[in-house]
């Protein structure tokens, strides 16, 4: 914890510097960052699971407490009003005393509605950051200072550059996720259902379903062809062929996001395709470096997918270059190579080219790519290529002049396996790339 405290101290200094810059740019006195509020289920008496404002947990690792407030002026230590009511109906989080609290001024907020009396009276030039705009208006925040776009753009853009504290937290999240993946793989090998595999993952990670940073994808057989499959079937298929798990973990608000695909049989075309995709993915990561646009690596992955489709004779009698140019790889890999990762699984500002919000969209042919930025030291990205057998995407190719290039018999034989996705989390450094996932020996 001493090391984490030191890293957090420097992290806080970085955030303070960013705050000074954005406040000066927009002629503001302070940022008022809200952890969030509970939302009651319609016509009921209980609340939806609380999800904290990511801009709040960037400053303090308080992730499960609503009605908290941060006052940031970039000069004085951040002031945290920590919500700690007297309540015998619900558990109340204790007032924090941890590695990070020495750098933050903490005051206890017993009643959520009292915050208006406790904040500094002058709020004319204060920007509210949060998802309760009506609360901000009630506090006297000007409408144009409620989530002002220029402030958000600046904060989001710079979140791409992770501090050493953030990287330390993300490495810890990796460790937890890897433990979960190994437990889930064992559950798969023992013949469990999707539902029970998910329980094994959650038990191993110490997470609840509402704690994981993104809904776990636990897919057997054809279910792996649904990119965001979260159904969790209770029944084990009569013939188990494949298992895809896309699941992460969280540490101090920072996410891990890992995917692995397994074949029930160690030999056969599908098992070999997994091995070969894994090799191509690692080979691509070996080429990655700062100074190159992420889009370029996405295109290069499609070239590698073309190579695999040809070597496995799923597509034939056409060059790899022509396959990519004519879009024949797209039905097999319909999503992007990956995305920024951090406080959110799909972290912000993937398209921002500067801290004023200049937007560079994904290429027209690849609309689902989530990042077009030039890679720079401190960025954390997922690398998650796939090869899927999705009938709705393949169907248009069954007709027309390109149909002759597809070996439909081999493709249809692989459809019952659903598809493959393999995902690692990498850090861009000056002169090297750190693969946090493989460093923990998750094959």
Curated annotation (Swiss-Prot):
Keywords: Dipeptidase, Hydrolase, Manganese, Metal-binding, Metalloprotease, Protease
Amino acids binding Mn(2+) 1: 257, 339, 384, 423
GO CC annotations on file: cytosol
GO biological process terms held by the UniProt record: proteolysis
EC numbers for this chain: 3.4.13.9
Xref: PROSITE patterns: PROLINE_PEPTIDASE
Signal peptide bounds: none
Cofactor(s) recorded in Swiss-Prot or TrEMBL: Mn(2+)
Pfam family, one: Peptidase_M24
Entry keyword annotation includes Protease: yes
SUPFAM superfamilies: Creatinase/aminopeptidase
Highest taxon of the lineage: Bacteria
Positions of Mn(2+) 2 binding: 246, 257, 423
Cysteine pairings via disulfide bonds: none
Family to which the UniProt record says this protein belongs: Belongs to the peptidase M24B family. Bacterial-type prolidase subfamily.
PANTHER family given in the database record: XAA-PRO AMINOPEPTIDASE 3, XAA-PRO DIPEPTIDASE
Chain's role: Splits dipeptides with a prolyl residue in the C-terminal position.
Protein name per UniProt: Xaa-Pro dipeptidase
Organism the protein comes from: Pectobacterium atrosepticum (strain SCRI 1043 / ATCC BAA-672)
Gene name, Swiss-Prot/TrEMBL: pepQ
């Amino acid at each position: 914890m001493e090391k984490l405290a030191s890293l957090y101290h420097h992290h806080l200094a970085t955030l303070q510097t960013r705050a000074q810059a954005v406040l000066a740019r927009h002629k503001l006195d302070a940022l008022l960052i809200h952890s969030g509020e509970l939302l009651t289920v319609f016509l009921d008496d209980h609340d939806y699971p609380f999800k904290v404002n990511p801009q709040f947990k960037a400053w303090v690792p308080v992730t499960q407490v609503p009605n908290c407030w941060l006052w940031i002026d970039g000069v004085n230590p951040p002031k945290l009003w920590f919500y700690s009511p007297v309540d015998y109906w619900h558990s109340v989080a204790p007032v924090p005393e941890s590695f990070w609290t020495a750098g933050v001024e903490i005051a206890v907020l017993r009643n959520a509605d009292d915050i208006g009396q406790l904040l500094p009276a002058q709020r004319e030039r204060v920007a509210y950051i949060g998802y309760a705009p009506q609360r901000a208006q009630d506090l006297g925040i000007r409408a144009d200072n409620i989530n002002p776009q220029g402030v958000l753009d600046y904060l989001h853009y710079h979140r791409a550059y992770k501090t050493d504290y953030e990287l330390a937290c993300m490495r810890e999240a990796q460790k937890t996720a890897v433990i979960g993946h190994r437990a889930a793989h064992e559950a798969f090998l023992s013949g469990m259902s999707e539902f029970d595999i998910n329980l094994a993952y959650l038990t191993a990670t110490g997470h609840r379903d509402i704690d994981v940073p993104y809904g776990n994808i636990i897919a057997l057989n054809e279910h792996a062809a649904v990119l965001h499959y979260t159904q969790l079937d209770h029944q084990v298929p009569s013939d188990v062929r494949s298992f895809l798990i896309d699941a992460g973990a969280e540490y101090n608000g920072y996410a891990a996001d890992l995917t692995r695909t397994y074949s029930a049989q160690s030999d056969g075309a599908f098992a070999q395709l997994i091995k070969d995709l894994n090799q191509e993915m690692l080979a691509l990561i070996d080429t990655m470096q700062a100074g190159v646009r992420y889009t370029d690596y996405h295109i290069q992955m499609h070239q590698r997918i073309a190579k695999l489709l040809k070597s496995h004779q799923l597509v034939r009698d056409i060059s790899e270059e022509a396959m990519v140019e004519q879009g024949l790889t797209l039905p097999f890999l319909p999503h992007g190579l990956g995305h920024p990762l951090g406080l959110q699984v799909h972290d912000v500002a993937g398209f921002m080219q500067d801290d004023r919000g200049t937007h560079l969209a994904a290429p027209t042919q690849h609309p689902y790519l989530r990042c077009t930025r030039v890679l720079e030291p401190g960025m954390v990205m997922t690398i998650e290529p796939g090869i899927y057998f999705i009938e709705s995407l393949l169907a248009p190719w069954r007709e027309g002049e390109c149909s002759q290039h597809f070996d439909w018999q081999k493709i249809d034989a692989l459809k019952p396996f659903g598809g493959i996705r393999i995902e690692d989390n990498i850090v861009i450094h000056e002169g090297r790339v750190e693969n946090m996932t493989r460093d923990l020996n998750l094959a």
